Amino acid sequence: MINYQSIKPWLFKLEPEDAHMLAEAALRIPNVCQVAFNPFLESHFITNSILKQELFGRTFFNPIGLGAGFDKNATMIRAMQILGFGFTEIGTITPKAQAGNPKPRMFRHIEEQSIQNAMGFNNEGLLSAQKRLKKRFPFTTPIGINIGKNKLTPDTQAINDYTTLIKALHELGDYLVINISSPNTPGLRDLQNEEFITKLFEESKAITSKPILLKIAPDMSKEDAVALTKLAVLKGADGIIATNTTVDYSLVKEPKSIGGLSGAVLKEKSFEIFEAVAKELYGKTTLISVGGISSAKEVYRRIKAGASLVQIYSGLIYEGPDLIKNINNELTELIKADGYTNITQAIGADRK
């Protein structure tokens, strides 16, 4: 197996989006010859019972998931299991295919181990995602589907985009995620308000009993984050994902003027919002933490703060395909060291 750190300098000479497309091409190979990757699956997909838990009616063999935005079109689901992820969140999917924002729209901040992206929900649309999901359904590991509105859809009609997606996709995933927190679709974050949240969840829960989660932005006060998430849960949200990328450009030395920051610079900002939400909602709903996570120590910090699951994206780019295996092995030891026999005992330990 090729050592990732030896090829990373070469990959990083490519434009970030070109490198991603190259990685996607490689990660689509298991779709046609999965058996060739069985040795990698056996070594990287950790099945230690200490990490196993039941959520959303499914078994999660470990708590590490792929964050939305990496597999936009449901082309790499099999590969993510081979890399060791306990679950995968695809998307963001919009009703109609859209090209996203003009290029260049993805940038590396290598010194800060971070990514800045202004992709703009580029994806092949609902019909394409639906076709791929149907072809591979049911899935060995849980699948989340992240959904968003089209750029040209007026805010007054945004709910129609979300309900259209829910109707078409709810039977093809294990949970759905309402994305109104990306900074790359004009006006999208303005939908993080009481009126829209109330109507959205009322209509969505009338369509399906499948879990529907809300993903929030980090660029709001703790008080606003708590108020928004409490309202969402009251209106029917089955979980909260905190957080999306940040537009706090002071976190990097040479920021671009567009897009959201992810990776190491987001770690503390995302944790602060997550912790504030967890203090109010731990034990009342399922909490998923994402933002700047790239080590077992940080995963365990989020778990003890109240996260049942965590998600990783930028860390995978900087650390490579062994990251998830290494985290799960180290996380197992951290849980054991605290005297627990299962991850569920550690979840929310700091809230008890």
From Swiss-Prot:
Task: Provide the binding site for substrate.
Answer: 72, 117-121, 179, 184, 244-245
The record's listing under InterPro entries reads: Aldolase_TIM, DHO_dehydrogenase, Dihydroorotate_DH_1_2, Dihydroorotate_DH_2, Dihydroorotate_DH_cat, Dihydroorotate_DH_CS
What reaction(s) does this enzyme catalyze? (S)-dihydroorotate + a quinone = orotate + a quinol
How are cofactors bound according to the entry's free-text note? Binds 1 FMN per subunit.
Membrane topology for this entry? Peripheral membrane protein
Q: Where does FMN bind?
A: 68-72, 92, 146, 179, 215, 243, 263, 292, 313-314
> Its Gene Ontology molecular function terms?
dihydroorotate dehydrogenase (quinone) activity
**SUPFAM superfamilies found in the cross-reference section:** FMN-linked oxidoreductases (SSF51395)
The protein's required cofactor(s) are namely: FMN
The alphabetical list of record keywords is: Cell membrane, Flavoprotein, FMN, Membrane, Oxidoreductase, Pyrimidine biosynthesis
Q: Which family does it belong to?
A: Belongs to the dihydroorotate dehydrogenase family. Type 2 subfamily.
The function of this protein is: Catalyzes the conversion of dihydroorotate to orotate with quinone as electron acceptor.
Q: Can you state the subunit structure given in the record?
A: Monomer.
- Indicate what this protein is called per its UniProt record: Dihydroorotate dehydrogenase (quinone)
What species does this protein belong to? Sulfurimonas denitrificans (strain ATCC 33889 / DSM 1251)
Gene of origin?
pyrD
